[in-house]
């Protein structure tokens, strides 16, 4: 059985198209796509087994923004209750990946205003006052009869407002439209980041629940091993069991105690991962209050899901706007060949002193006609065309990727549902086997080798059942992500609606 470890290694891998915005000057944070670091993991215990193997990529994990958060709030001495809905709410506000995506939208909005400034009026003012003295002969080589060679000192005052306005510049117009498409792309990327945040938070919450179930199962197995050890000791004292039976049961007890310690440690560490991803104060203790029971999900038809996925997926809409932005950028490059018309004007007061100043005005219009620019326009067009081709190819690749993710999610959902049924039956059979083995040992029919083997089989069956439940619930939320409804319908999918 494959074991997917979405919780800790959810977002490793190459950046997807959804987190990027096409611009030579601007690039939003990459939105990594979820991937499974352990493609084929044998069931040897629980979800934690594969996760520990995935922690070999710890450095990559620690650099992933979706696994970090911006801590907020005050530390409480008492443990706080944390439901799944609370965790998602905190994550949407404080997860680092979501916060960076929001900042990218602000950055794109600033770039749009920068492009728009070339079309809007520019007004500046300038005020100056000075005192001058001129040597006429030294400056101009003139001698004026009956006049001193030095004129002045005299004052000069000028206060003026300057206006520049682009009347027609098709290149700037297309660049503004391109930046508007970039802004829309950034906004859709931010929405896609929220989808990924929900995917990460829910998956980590599910893994924490699985670890908690593992710890409870390990505690139950420890109690059973303790009872078996006491039973073997009593039977040895009664002369029914041998010393090796006591030693065997004692070794089994210590093994179960060790597993309980490991399970509790894994649970504590997974809680730290979850707390960091949702931005809880460092060191804040919490208790998970949402219990995710087995609820079978019956999704819509595969064809309907594939058709609706592209329309619902924010990363697809983001990439569509990137293509639009690249198209407009190419038009802007072509428009560099077109003439442009601008206007300039100024009005102000000039005089010897502010009190004796008079109003003056200047106005001019400028027509610029490009004739030869050394091949710059041709180069800009080639680069813009290459960028457009790249974005179109990325869009088609993303379309195929979305369909693959939907198909994968449907396959996982069906397979994991079957595995839950099989593993639940295995737990029932293993429990019956342990009960019969204990009865046989109590009756003196056999030694406790059968009991130890049956207890090990039950432990493996319990762990596999916990893993199958975790995988099935992750398959649900993965389907919600693949169809673009993770934020709006994650709770309904987990409930089987």
Protein language model regions, located:
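Transmembrane beta-barrel architecture of outer-membrane proteins
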Residues: 83, 107, 156-158, 203, ...
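Regulatory alphaC helix of protein kinase catalytic domains
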Residues: 60-90
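Bacterial N-terminal signal peptides
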Residues: 9-19
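Amphipathic alpha-helical coiled-coil segments
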Residues: 100-115, 193, 197-218, 227-229, ...
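Amphipathic alpha-helical coiled-coil scaffold segments and their short linker/junction regions
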Residues: 88-92, 146-147, 241, 245-252, ...
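Acidic, low-complexity, intrinsically disordered peripheral segments
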Residues: 2-7, 20-51, 133, 282, ...
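Periplasmic alpha-helical coiled-coil/stalk elements that build and connect Gram-negative outer-membrane
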Residues: 194-308, 412, 416, 457-458
């Amino acid at each position: 059985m494959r074991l997917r470890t979405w919780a800790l290694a959810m977002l490793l891998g190459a950046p997807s198209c959804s987190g990027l915005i096409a611009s030579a000057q601007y690039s939003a944070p990459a939105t990594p796509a979820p991937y499974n670091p352990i493609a084929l993991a044998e069931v040897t215990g629980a979800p934690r087994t594969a996760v520990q193997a995935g922690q070999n990529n710890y450095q990559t994990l620690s650099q992933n923004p979706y696994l970090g958060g911006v801590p907020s709030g005050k530390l409480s001495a008492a443990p706080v209750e944390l439901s799944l809905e609370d965790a998602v709410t905190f994550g949407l506000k404080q997860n680092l990946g979501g916060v960076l995506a929001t900042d990218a939208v602000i950055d794109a909005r600033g770039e749009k205003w920068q492009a728009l400034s070339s079309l809007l009026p520019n007004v500046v003012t300038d005020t100056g006052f000075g005192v001058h003295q001129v040597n006429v002969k030294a400056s101009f080589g003139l001698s004026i009869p009956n006049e001193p060679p030095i004129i002045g000192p005299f004052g000069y005052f000028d206060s003026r407002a300057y206006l520049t306005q682009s009347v027609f510049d098709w290149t700037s117009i297309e660049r503004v439209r391109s930046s508007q498409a970039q802004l829309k792309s950034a906004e859709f990327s931010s929405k896609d980041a929220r989808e990924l945040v929900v995917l990460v938070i829910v998956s980590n919450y599910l893994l924490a629940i699985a670890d908690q179930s593992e710890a409870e199962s390990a505690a139950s197995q420890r109690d059973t091993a303790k009872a078996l050890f006491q039973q073997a000791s009593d039977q040895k004292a009664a002369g029914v069991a041998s010393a090796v039976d006591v030693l065997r049961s004692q070794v089994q007890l210590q093994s179960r105690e060790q597993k309980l310690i490991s399970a509790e440690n894994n649970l504590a560490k997974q809680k730290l991962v979850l707390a960091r991803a949702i931005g809880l104060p460092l060191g804040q203790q919490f208790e998970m209050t949402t219990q995710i029971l087995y609820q079978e999900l019956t999704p819509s038809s595969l064809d309907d899901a594939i058709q609706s996925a592209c329309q619902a997926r924010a990363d697809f809409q983001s990439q569509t706007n990137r293509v639009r932005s690249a198209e407009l950028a190419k038009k802007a490059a072509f428009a560099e060949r077109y003439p442009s018309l601008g206007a300039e004007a100024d009005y102000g007061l000039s005089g010897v002193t502010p009190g004796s100043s008079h109003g003056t005005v200047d106005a001019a219009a400028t027509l610029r006609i490009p004739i030869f620019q050394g091949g710059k326009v041709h180069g800009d067009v080639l680069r813009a065309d290459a960028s457009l081709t790249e974005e179109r190819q990325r869009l088609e690749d993303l379309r195929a990727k979305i369909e693959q993710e939907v198909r994968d999610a449907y396959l996982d959902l069906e397979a994991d549902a079957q595995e839950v049924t099989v593993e639940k039956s295995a737990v029932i059979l293993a429990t019956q086997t342990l009960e019969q083995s204990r009865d046989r040992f109590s009756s003196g029919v056999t030694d406790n080798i059968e009991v130890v083997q049956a207890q090990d089989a039950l432990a493996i069956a319990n762990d596999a059942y916990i893993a199958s439940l975790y995988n099935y619930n992750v398959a649900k939320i993965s389907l919600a992500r693949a169809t673009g409804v993770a934020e709006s319908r994650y709770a309904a999918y987990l409930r089987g609606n």
